[in-house]
């Protein structure tokens, strides 16, 4: 049995009880408890990126069965979620199978979600929201090479471009407690992690392919390709009907800008020198994404886009059994703004691009140097700079924050053992998206201050 209690000021807190029963090849898990999530959204008033204004309290209970059968592992799960404040109830079910074979492994998962909202004493009718999701992945090993591929098709709650980001009124959205399958390659570099793409469980079709293999006895190569889009291509009306949207279904990722496409190509080389005391990792990354579909009519096509090119480098030197030094450098070039095309009946279309920044290209640099002693002590110095910071364009930016386009920090940490670590930090952090273990969360900027972190793992 397990009792869990955790509450965070600006994330997700939970209290609950978990029980597990094992017998032969079967495992049953039962959970029950409540979850409180806090987010900040522009849909509601009093928006402040550092202060939550949207609160959701849920009571959950469910069970999961896992069974080893015919050299495979099959599983089924259901989860019931109640939200009293919003008079909402959700039912989630899942079926999955994991089957290893001689030269690889296959995994498949299907999920369904039903959301019902009670109208209470009002005459408002709330339709039942039904959503589904499918995910499959396959890994194959050929001599020293491996290839992994996956396909996902999530349609938990598909909404048109005018309402898709309204987390308050879209009561059929995927829940915060739902987690998407992790990507094959998780970026360990600062700038690349910040530009990672989160899987949209509500509406996304995607594929991923990764190829890994040796180039020599000391060097390896990794090729990663990701492509995803909305499950629909969206079209807007004209004139008085400009706010009305329609869509055509996509069953494979689309490159059409009206489908919120995302595409990433990442190539990495890594390995050791002949003496084995120097490890290197260097790569190239290209990303393209359409964030918003503003208009896609016979008159005007307008999209918010982002392109980035990143060069990451990491070198680790083992000086002796006690000391090692690591150097990390990232160079990034970003283009973000609005692409607009005004269509003409005479064939002379007007194309334009409006940058979201004062410059056409944002240039980011991140440099970090760390030293480790005896696997106990670590010392870190980092510096990040840009020629234009998009956060400074927000009129609600707190005036107490430094408007300089650079962030520097120094930290020292001591590891008492594998479960106890103490860190003292001074300086600034730019903030942004941070993805670890397949979960992404937004880190708020930290400006010229002191932070003390103590982490403890309790078995």
Where in the sequence are the language-model features?
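Outer membrane beta-barrel
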Residues: 1-37, 138-161, 431
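Short Pro/Gly-enriched beta-strand edge/turn motifs at strand-loop
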Residues: 2, 47, 192-193
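Alpha-helix capping and helix-loop boundary segments enriched in small/acidic/polar residues
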Residues: 7, 52-56, 125-126
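Hydrophobic, small-residue-rich alpha-helical packing segments that form membrane-like cores
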Residues: 15, 20, 28-89
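Secondary-structure boundary elements
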Residues: 21-26, 66-71, 99-104, 214-218
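Exposed, low-structure sequence patches enriched in small/polar residues
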Residues: 78-103, 107-459
